[in-house]
């Protein structure tokens, strides 16, 4: 142990992080903070992490344990530890006895706590995964990846070593003897840094050599290229010689990576470098492996990791020690690293820049596009299997990136008619694009594939929830324009995936068997998937399941865990190195992983999973190419089995209609037709699809007459692969001209065996219903939903306070509080260029790698236990941090309550307005939380000590965190909404009375506009009460109010407004008008209260007089100033001067604050008697009677002094 301690002391270099193994999911050891004592005599103080535990033999310390004097071996518990500053090569087993000694001699090290936590984490891991799944040290962590530096040590040369699967920041100095088994890596380091290699490089500005065609695979490659790959290499070489930037657009699975490496290797043979490769995070490791396979003589450096890792790379891997010549031949990096590394990467003069998945550059306004445009490169190659994904704009973005001079103006091209447009496009693209298809070049090398669309009926629960979402969004669907229609569509997509995706909709079960049964019963897709998966496993197939939603992945994990099937998972939260580990584990020989769960975007790009032979698209992507990318993970070079692809789609839902829309996107590859953005009418058309038939099932047997039934025979037919070859041949000829002909739709036996003609007639009826255009849009929803919506609203009001809602009952859609602003609804979008999906569809490039690594990774877990029984009392608080629950309200639910409160106030204290936004809560739960909320904002701290002020600034008296809530602001907001309701009642009772007095109209500039008159204010005030404060867009678009037309006239804007900016001007106009009326209403009420006080106390005459009195704060005179300076203390003079300035500048502000808080002393008391204790607190806090003075404190805040 002493020798180890000495070695630890002389070690230098970067300190490593904790290792990234699965155990980190459960344990995050706190950094030990030394509170005294020294570690120099205790090596255990140098422990970085405990890795493992075992009962192992060791020599006994008992001298009498052996007759011949040789120590007897005894088995004791030992811990495997990693030491700070040392690599995994130097981990040691330490007996538990050594730890026990340190507990007593060095308590400040907190070793007992660390050991206890480790043991607890190990117990959990083994219980959930089994001991066989635990690996303390991966072999890669002890395998030298690269040597990046050399220095002279005490015992000879030392090398700075980067180990495989570990970041550069986890590099360690090792003596040559420590890594003597890695002589090849030592020699490679010496070769890279040799003077002969430095002198070999030439400037890449020299003239390009003439094109020389390769007839055979070049000798500098260590593998053999297919004929079409050799053709691709020659295409890239030819474009280089002609100085033409290009797109290599071969279909997925044809080896674009290998062709690109061959091209860079050919340039390297001409001493041309450096080169840059930018690739997705999920494929960067594969690029490194392919370089090692095909061009191992090239120095390839991967530029990834956090800032510390990148600093190590820049210091040791970028340049030779002499001069500024690049040491690397190829730099691999990810999209995420381009922007943070721009200061390091952009100054380099690249010979060739290759961008994998180049369609990521389709948006010229993206950060990636902007950053890469700043790089200097003599040649650019984009790799993409899908160059034309959505529209002409995106294609031109790619071409503009390649050649800004040739493709400078999209407008010029769009002026050409369709036929000439297509012809000219092909002519312009010809020198820049090479695209081959698998069916053309791999007829005999890749087994055929077959895709089936499986139409599935929704479960009864899904149908109820689906209808509830539509019904509760009746007002959204019947508006001419409402950006929130995209939210409705998203909710319907979630219902189709599984109803449990909706917030807090999942029921709570303690019994795992019952939970599993309900999980299956809730989803028609999952029921079919269960039948298929059982048979696929029996037949020895391996499966990939793709979905859009991370929550769906969790539900599928629950399913697989209950089935006790081994699986892997990748989504956007899994780090790059961990992704490759999981891919390798799945692809390993004799792997026991039956299935791979993947999000379409994170797991559908550039990875090879050809060891599977079945793909299930659980829910489709808006972009059909994303699904094709996912399929290509299996159907590619290296596949030896026939491939089956199943796409699950719920019959008569938005999913089925979406398939029709994706058809247009796919046709764009052959007929460029311009913009393909989804407009309001298209979104509405998707939602309407099948809605009439769904609601017609309520009172008859029509719903059961067309139900699709998948029995055992049907499942066997689905999984039969004997006819794959015949199907594939029939599709080949037309698959590039008609997207849907790629698929064979599976419509198996109907329960009632309806004939084909009737089925076609039904399908045609659905199509006709779904194609109702904009003129009939409103009438469609009114005819279908109006009566149901009104009945539902009436039932909801009558049952308020009695109805209990849980996961099994009808769900009420959220009142769309997303993005609520206190002042304006500017966030409401009217034009939908594309649908923003809140799922795992997010682009990985938008999230830095470091940020993803900070997120907790998902691990295999047992079936999730449900929350407490309904009869159990809900505690005031449980959990902590972001998982804190207050009376059962999580962070999101508390935020919804707060924003609803700001919008409506407390209403009549019946919480009616809170029911829909908080559909996941029962009325009783809302009521209890509402009373607690009012109690909190009514608190009036009386302890003025410094410590107490600090505490009360953070928590309420009962210990609940304040979470930044301003009580005074909320009380003012609540009372104003009460005043609005009172004003509405007054206007209803006095229809001929003026809205405001002439004095108030003059004071707050509420005069009539060019067209708007007092009668418009008379309808605007009730609109605020109806829609809530700040909901200007909803107020403007409310046809019953009809304020939009007069606002257009006031602003001289065409009606109806046809641009987003015009609609924004109208909303701003309404907001400003309401703000003026708000001030006026507060003023009127304050005048009323003061008048009553004056009458009762014979003190003061009017509010106008009170205003004058408020402004009579006298400054300190110069004589008084002189008096304060008698003791020669400058601070007194400065304080007096500061007060004078405050009087002059803040008097008006003080009066406005007085206006805000003065009238609130009685409004809550008059409104809700049952809350009298809380009401008294509210009144106390807000009262500013005649016995109070209003002053400014040192921070220029209004305070009340008794």
From Swiss-Prot:
<comment type="function">
    <text>Chromatin remodeling factor that represses the expression of embryonic trait genes upon and after seed germination and thus enables the developmental switch to post-germinative growth.</text>
</comment>
<dbReference type="InterPro" id="IPR000330">
    <property type="entry name" value="SNF2_N"/>
</dbReference>
<dbReference type="Pfam" id="PF06461">
    <property type="entry name" value="CHDII_SANT-like"/>
</dbReference>
<dbReference type="InterPro" id="IPR001650">
    <property type="entry name" value="Helicase_C-like"/>
</dbReference>
<feature type="domain" description="Chromo 1">
    <location>
        <begin position="45"/>
        <end position="109"/>
    </location>
</feature>
<dbReference type="InterPro" id="IPR049730">
    <property type="entry name" value="SNF2/RAD54-like_C"/>
</dbReference>
<dbReference type="GO" id="GO:0003677">
    <property type="term" value="F:DNA binding"/>
</dbReference>
<feature type="domain" description="Helicase ATP-binding">
    <location>
        <begin position="237"/>
        <end position="405"/>
    </location>
</feature>
<dbReference type="Pfam" id="PF00176">
    <property type="entry name" value="SNF2-rel_dom"/>
</dbReference>
<dbReference type="GO" id="GO:0004386">
    <property type="term" value="F:helicase activity"/>
</dbReference>
<dbReference type="InterPro" id="IPR023780">
    <property type="entry name" value="Chromo_domain"/>
</dbReference>
<keyword id="KW-0547">Nucleotide-binding</keyword>
<comment type="similarity">
    <text>Belongs to the SNF2/RAD54 helicase family.</text>
</comment>
<dbReference type="GO" id="GO:0006338">
    <property type="term" value="P:chromatin remodeling"/>
</dbReference>
<dbReference type="GO" id="GO:0005634">
    <property type="term" value="C:nucleus"/>
</dbReference>
<dbReference type="InterPro" id="IPR009463">
    <property type="entry name" value="DUF1087"/>
</dbReference>
<dbReference type="InterPro" id="IPR009462">
    <property type="entry name" value="CHD_II_SANT-like"/>
</dbReference>
<keyword id="KW-0238">DNA-binding</keyword>
<feature type="binding site">
    <location>
        <begin position="250"/>
        <end position="257"/>
    </location>
    <ligand>
        <name>ATP</name>
    </ligand>
</feature>
<dbReference type="InterPro" id="IPR038718">
    <property type="entry name" value="SNF2-like_sf"/>
</dbReference>
<keyword id="KW-0539">Nucleus</keyword>
<feature type="compositionally biased region" description="Basic residues">
    <location>
        <begin position="853"/>
        <end position="867"/>
    </location>
</feature>
<feature type="domain" description="Helicase C-terminal">
    <location>
        <begin position="528"/>
        <end position="679"/>
    </location>
</feature>
<keyword id="KW-0378">Hydrolase</keyword>
<dbReference type="GO" id="GO:0005524">
    <property type="term" value="F:ATP binding"/>
</dbReference>
<dbReference type="InterPro" id="IPR016197">
    <property type="entry name" value="Chromo-like_dom_sf"/>
</dbReference>
<keyword id="KW-0347">Helicase</keyword>
<dbReference type="InterPro" id="IPR000953">
    <property type="entry name" value="Chromo/chromo_shadow_dom"/>
</dbReference>
<protein>
    <recommendedName>
        <fullName>CHD3-type chromatin-remodeling factor CHR7</fullName>
        <ecNumber>3.6.4.-</ecNumber>
    </recommendedName>
</protein>
<dbReference type="InterPro" id="IPR014001">
    <property type="entry name" value="Helicase_ATP-bd"/>
</dbReference>
<dbReference type="Pfam" id="PF00385">
    <property type="entry name" value="Chromo"/>
</dbReference>
<feature type="domain" description="Chromo 2">
    <location>
        <begin position="142"/>
        <end position="201"/>
    </location>
</feature>
<feature type="region of interest" description="Disordered">
    <location>
        <begin position="838"/>
        <end position="872"/>
    </location>
</feature>
<keyword id="KW-0677">Repeat</keyword>
<dbReference type="Pfam" id="PF00271">
    <property type="entry name" value="Helicase_C"/>
</dbReference>
<dbReference type="InterPro" id="IPR027417">
    <property type="entry name" value="P-loop_NTPase"/>
</dbReference>
<keyword id="KW-0067">ATP-binding</keyword>
<feature type="short sequence motif" description="DEAH box">
    <location>
        <begin position="356"/>
        <end position="359"/>
    </location>
</feature>
<dbReference type="GO" id="GO:0016787">
    <property type="term" value="F:hydrolase activity"/>
</dbReference>
<dbReference type="Pfam" id="PF06465">
    <property type="entry name" value="DUF1087"/>
</dbReference>
<keyword id="KW-0156">Chromatin regulator</keyword>
């Amino acid at each position: 142990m002493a020798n180890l301690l000495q070695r630890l002391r002389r070690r230098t270099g970067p300190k490593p992080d904790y290792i990234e193994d699965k155990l980190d999911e459960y344990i995050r050891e706190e950094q030990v903070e030394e509170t005294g004592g020294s570690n120099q005599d205790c090596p255990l103080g140098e422990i970085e992490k405990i890795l493992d535990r075992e009962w192992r033999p060791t020599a006994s310390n008992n001298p009498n344990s052996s007759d011949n004097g040789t120590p007897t071996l005894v088995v004791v518990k030992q811990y495997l530890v990693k030491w700070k500053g040392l690599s995994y090569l130097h981990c040691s087993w330490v007996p538990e006895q050594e730890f026990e000694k340190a507990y007593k001699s060095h308590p400040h090290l907190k070793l007992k706590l660390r050991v206890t936590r480790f043991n607890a984490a190990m117990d959990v891991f083994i219980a959930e995964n089994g001991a066989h799944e635990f690996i303390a040290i991966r072999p890669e962590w002890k395998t030298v990846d690269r040597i990046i530096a050399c220095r002279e040590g005490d015992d000879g040369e030392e090398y700075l070593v980067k180990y495989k699967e570990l970041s550069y920041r986890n590099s360690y100095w090792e003596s040559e003897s420590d890594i003597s088994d890695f002589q090849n890596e030592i020699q490679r380091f010496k070769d890279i840094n040799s003077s002969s290699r430095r002198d070999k490089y030439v400037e890449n500005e020299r003239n390009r050599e003439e094109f020389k065609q390769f007839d055979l695979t070049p000798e500098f490659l260590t593998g053999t290229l297919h004929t079409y790959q050799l053709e691709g290499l020659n295409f890239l070489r030819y474009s280089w010689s002609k100085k033409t930037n290009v797109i290599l657009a071969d279909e997925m699975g044809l080896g674009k990576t290998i062709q690109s490496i061959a091209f860079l290797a050919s340039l390297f043979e001409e001493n041309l470098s450096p080169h840059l490769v930018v690739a997705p995070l999920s494929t960067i490791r594969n690029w490194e492996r392919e370089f090692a396979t095909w061009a191992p003589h090239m120095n390839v450096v991967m530029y990834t990791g956090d800032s510390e890792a990148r600093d190590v790379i820049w210091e040791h891997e970028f340049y030779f020690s002499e001069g500024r010549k690049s040491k690397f031949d190829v730099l691999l990096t990810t999209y995420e690293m381009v922007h943070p590394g721009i200061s390091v990467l952009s100054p380099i003069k690249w010979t060739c820049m290759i961008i994998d998945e180049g369609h990521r550059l389709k948006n010229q306004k993206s950060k990636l596009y902007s950053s890469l445009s700043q790089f200097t490169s003599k040649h650019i190659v984009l790799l993409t299997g899908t160059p034309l994904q959505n529209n002409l704009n995106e294609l031109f973005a790619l071409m503009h990136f390649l050649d800004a001079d040739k493709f400078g103006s999209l407008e010029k091209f769009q002026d050409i008619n369709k036929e000439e447009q297509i012809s000219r496009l092909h002519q312009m693209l010809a020198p820049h694009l090479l695209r081959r298809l698998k069916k053309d070049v791999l007829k005999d090398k890749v087994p055929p594939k077959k895709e089936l669309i499986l139409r599935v009926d929704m479960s009864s629960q899904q149908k109820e929830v689906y209808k509830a979402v539509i019904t509760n969004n009746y007002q959204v669907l019947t508006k001419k324009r409402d950006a929130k229609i995209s939210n409705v569509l998203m909710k319907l997509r979630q219902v189709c995936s599984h109803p449990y995706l909706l917030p807090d909709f999942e029921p709570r079960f303690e019994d795992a068997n019952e939970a599993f049964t309900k999980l299956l019963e809730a989803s028609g897709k999952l029921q079919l998937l269960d039948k298929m998966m059982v048979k696929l496993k029996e037949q020895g197939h391996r499966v990939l399941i793709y979905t859009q939603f991370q929550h769906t992945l969790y539900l599928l994990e629950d399913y697989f865990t209950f089935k006790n099937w081994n699986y892997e998972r990748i989504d956007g939260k899994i780090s790059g190195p961990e992704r490759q580990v999981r891919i390798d584990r799945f692809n390993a020989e004799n792997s026991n992983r039956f299935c791979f769960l993947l999000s379409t975007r994170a797991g559908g790009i550039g990875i090879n999973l050809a060891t599977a032979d079945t793909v299930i698209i659980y829910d489709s992507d808006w972009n059909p190419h994303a699904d094709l990318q996912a399929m290509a993970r299996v159907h590619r070079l290296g596949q030896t089995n026939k491939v089956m692809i199943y796409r699950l789609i719920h019959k008569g839902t938005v999913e089925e209609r979406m398939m029709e829309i994706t058809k247009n996107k796919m046709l764009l590859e052959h007929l460029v037709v311009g913009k393909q953005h989804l407009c309001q009418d298209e979104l509405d058309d998707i939602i309407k699809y099948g809605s009439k038939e769904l609601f017609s099932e309520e009172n008859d047997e029509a719903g059961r007459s067309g139900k699709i039934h998948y029995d055992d025979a049907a499942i066997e037919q689905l999984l039969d692969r004997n006819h794959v070859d015949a199907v594939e041949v029939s599709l080949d000829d037309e698959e590039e001209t008609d997207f849907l002909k790629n698929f064979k739709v599976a419509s198996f036996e109907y329960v009632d065996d309806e004939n084909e003609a009737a089925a076609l007639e039904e399908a045609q009826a659905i199509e006709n219903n779904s194609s109702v255009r904009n003129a009939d849009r409103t009438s469609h929803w009114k005819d279908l939903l109006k009566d149901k919506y009104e009945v539902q609203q009436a039932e909801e009001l009558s049952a308020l306070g009695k109805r209990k809602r849980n996961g099994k009952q009808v769900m009420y859609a959220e009142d769309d509080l997303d993005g609520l602003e206190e002042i304006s609804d500017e966030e409401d979008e009217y034009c939908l260029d594309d649908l923003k999906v809140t799922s795992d569809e997010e682009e990985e490039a938008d999230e830095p790698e470091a940020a993803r690594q900070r997120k907790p990774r998902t691990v295999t877990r047992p079936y999730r236990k449900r929350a407490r029984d309904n009869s159990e009392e809900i505690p005031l608080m449980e959990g902590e941090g972001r998982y804190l629950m207050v009376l059962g309200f999580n962070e999101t639910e508390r935020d919804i309550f707060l924003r609803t409160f700001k919008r409506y106030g407390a209403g009549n204290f019946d919480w009616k307005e809170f029911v829909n936004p908080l559909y996941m809560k029962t009325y009783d739960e809302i009521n209890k939380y509402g009373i607690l909320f009012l109690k909190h904002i009514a608190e009036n701290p009386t302890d003025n000590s410094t410590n107490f002020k600090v505490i009360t600034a953070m928590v309420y008296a009962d210990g609940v965190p304040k979470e930044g809530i301003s009580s005074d602001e909320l009380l003012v907001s609540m009372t104003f909404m009460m005043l609005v309701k009172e004003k509405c009642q007054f206007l209803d009772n006095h229809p001929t009375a003026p809205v405001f007095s002439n004095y108030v109209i003059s004071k707050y500039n509420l005069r009539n506009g060019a067209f708007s008159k007092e009668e418009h204010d008379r309808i605007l005030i009730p609109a605020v009460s109806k829609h809530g404060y700040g909901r200007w867009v909803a107020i403007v678009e409310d046809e019953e109010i009809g304020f939009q037309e007069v606002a257009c006239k006031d602003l001289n804007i065409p009606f109806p407004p046809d641009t987003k900016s015009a609609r924004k001007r109208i909303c701003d106009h309404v907001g400003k008008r309401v703000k003026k009326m708000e001030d006026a209403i507060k003023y009127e009420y304050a005048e009323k209260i003061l008048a009553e006080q004056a009458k009762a106390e014979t003190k003061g005459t009017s509010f106008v007089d009170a205003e004058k009195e408020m402004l009579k704060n006298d400054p300190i005179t110069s004589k008084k100033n002189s008096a304060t300076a008698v003791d020669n203390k400058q601070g007194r003079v400065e304080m007096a001067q500061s007060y004078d300035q405050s009087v002059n500048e803040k008097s008006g502000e003080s009066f406005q604050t007085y206006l805000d808080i003065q009238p609130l002393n009685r409004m809550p008391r008059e409104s809700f008697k049952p809350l009298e204790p809380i009401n008294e607190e509210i009144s106390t806090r807000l009262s500013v009677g005649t016995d109070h003075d209003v002053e400014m404190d040192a921070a220029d805040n209004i305070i009340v002094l008794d």
